[in-house]
Swiss-Prot record:
Annotated positions binding Mg(2+) 6: 433
Gene assigned in the entry: mgtE
Spans within the Extracellular topological domain: 307-311, 449-451
Entry-linked PROSITE patterns: CBS
Entries under InterPro entries matching the protein: CBS_dom, CBS_dom_sf, Mg_transptr_MgtE_intracell_dom, MgtE_N_sf, MgtE_transporter, SLC41_membr_dom, SLC41_membr_dom_sf
Catalysis: reaction(s): Mg(2+)(in) = Mg(2+)(out)
Protein name listed in UniProt: Magnesium transporter MgtE
Positions contributing to Mg(2+) 1 binding: 64, 228
Signal peptide range in chain numbering: none
Length: 451
């Protein structure tokens, strides 16, 4: 029955069950829902029903649901369920998720919650919180299966069964020596295909791809993407195994980094969502826009400088927006290609040279097609072949310049260790506006007496 219900129907059904105190019917509904569904229902239901909704959920339900909620709602849940239930849920949460959640709390509340947790779990969480914010150590979990290299397949299976319930991932078994150094890795498939008395060290892969605990999360994401891993081991000095990073955490990193790059690319300000207040959104966007406003005044100065040319040939004004707009568009297209390549670290010297020449050839093809089209349009529209030549040649040159600026500027910034996404959309477009107007009016001035 639940499968065919919309979220609105589900919320209404749950509210009725909460009101009537029908715990058994409530459980039958909840048992058919995924953690995401429970989290969505909590966020969307009226505030007055949330406390009772949480009181009817088990600790396991709350633990699973918290993992699907945004930080602000996670804090709401922990505050509403009370200290005892919150502590039980925190003991079962993934340590990396809990470490990130506790960062949002004030020191006093953080210490209270950590002290109320099981000693082993509290120690593990505090260990993660000692790592830098965007490092592999901060996002790793200590809930994984490691096996001594002297184990047999039979011993490994016994340990795997005992740890399967609490381990975040059992796709890979990590093999260590007496010093807890990572010496190999074994897949679950290889384990079950091995003979019971066969040694793990005879089955394991010794070339292990791992991440350093202090390595940036984006670099870890690239490693997992490159090798198609479901998890990657995290090591400290001397290759000592300290945890693993799983692919679900990497997906969160990729989404977050993509959001940040898009915000920079659009110069729209950081952390702006549908719920952001208007004055906050305006405050975050204004610095870029004010900067671009003053840069844009240069375009106005250029037009003012060539005022005499405009007075003599008014038709020049008709094509001015088209020339500057097309230049900005092609620059933004090239910029998107380069930023994507840089974000995936596909750029080496050979690739950069090949990309620049490829974009140059592309701009020539695009410029040739567009300039021929606009020449035909201007001749038919204005009946002036020379005007058509001026517009077409200007467009041809500006499209080449726009494409190359969108290609070369982010590469230069990358080499200077500056985030290339900063030199994005609006800035490239504004700079290309200036260049396109200079070229357009420069060519027009050269032929002004013949026009």
């Amino acid at each position: 029955m639940v499968q065919n219900m919309t979220y609105d129907e589900l919320i209404l059904r749950i509210i009725i069950l909460l009101r009537d105190g029908k715990i058994r019917d409530f459980r039958s509904v909840i048992d058919e829902l995924q953690p995401y569904d429970m989290a969505f229902i909590f966020k969307e239901m009226p505030e007055k029903h949330r406390a009772r909704y949480l009181s009817y959920l088990t600790v396991d339900d709350i633990t699973d649901m918290i993992g699907e909620l945004e930080r602000e709602f996670q804090l709401v849940v922990l505050n509403k369920v009370g200290k005892t239930k919150a502590t039980l849920a925190m003991n079962k949460m993934d340590n990396d998720d809990l470490a990130q959640l506790l960062e949002e709390m004030d020191e006093e509340l953080k210490e209270q919650l950590l002290s109320s947790m099981e000693a082993s779990e509290s120690k593990a969480v505090q260990l993660l919180m000692n790592y830098p914010a965007d490092s592999a150590g901060r996002m790793m979990t200590n809930r994984y299966v490691w096996i001594p290299q002297h184990y047999t397949v039979k011993d490994a299976v016994v340990k795997l069964k005992s740890f399967a319930e609490i381990a975040e991932s059992i796709n890979y078994l990590y093999v260590i020596n007496e010093s807890k150094q990572l010496v190999g890795v074994l897949s679950y498939r290889d384990l079950i295909l091995g003979e019971p008395e066969e040694k793990v060290q005879d089955l394991m892969f010794t070339r292990v791809i791992s991440a350093d605990a202090l390595q940036d999360q984006e670099e870890v994401a690239r490693l997992i993407e490159r090798y198609d891993f479901l998890a990657i081991p995290v090591v400290e000095e001397n290759n000592v195994l300290v945890g693993i990073v799983t692919v679900d955490d990497i997906i969160d990193v990729v989404i977050r980094e993509a959001d940040e790059d898009y915000e920079k690319f659009a110069a729209s300000g950081k952390d702006i969502t549908f719920d952001t207040k208007a004055y906050v959104a305006a405050y975050r966007r204004l610095p870029w826009l004010i900067l671009l406003l003053f840069i844009g005044l240069i375009s106005g100065s250029i037009i003012s400088y060539f005022e005499d040319a405009l007075k003599q040939v008014v038709a020049l004004a008709f094509f001015m927006p088209m020339v500057s707009g097309m230049t900005g568009n092609t620059g933004t297209q090239s910029l998107a290609v380069v930023i994507r390549g840089l974000s995936k670290e596909e750029m080496n010297k050979k690739t950069i040279v090949r990309l620049i020449f490829r974009e140059f050839r592309t701009s020539i093809f695009i410029g040739a097609v567009c300039s021929v089209l606009i020449a035909i349009v201007s001749i038919i529209w204005q009946g002036n072949a020379l005007l058509g030549f001026v517009v077409a040649s200007s467009l041809f040159l500006t499209l080449i310049i726009g494409t190359m600026s969108g290609t070369i500027i982010p590469i230069i910034l990358h080499k200077l260790k500056v985030d290339p996404a900063i030199a994005s959309g609006p800035l490239i477009t504004t700079l290309n506006d200036i260049l396109s107007l200079l070229i357009y009016f420069g060519i027009a001035t050269a032929f002004i007496h013949s026009l």
